[in-house]
């Protein structure tokens, strides 16, 4: 664990057992289910697969970027960023946050519209063009898509690319 002025990095030996882009919705896997089950029983850890969902809820409440997960050949690193202002966020932070929040909403059966993302990013209604740009960038990255291509722009809803 390393702590910096604007981020916290946590590294772990071994790679993820699931695709990093499907970390919110994929059924969890354990390297050692017997130990994992025991740790849940003694309340050292919680139910499998709820960590990133709960992390996204916390990030949303603080209006900070979604975690960045990097996988190497023999390690996984998670970076949690702390930016005071959306203007300080990097473009990739905005795209990652839009995508992961869309995934979070999808698995929780919440429709994602511009207003939902404005709330996630802490953007006022009068600045909705900022969110429209983030949505466009995330769609261009191939991470989200329209849930219905035949609706008017004000009625657009978004879902993850894999939905």
Which residues are covered by each model-predicted region?
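C-terminal regulatory or interaction extensions
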Residues: 1-163
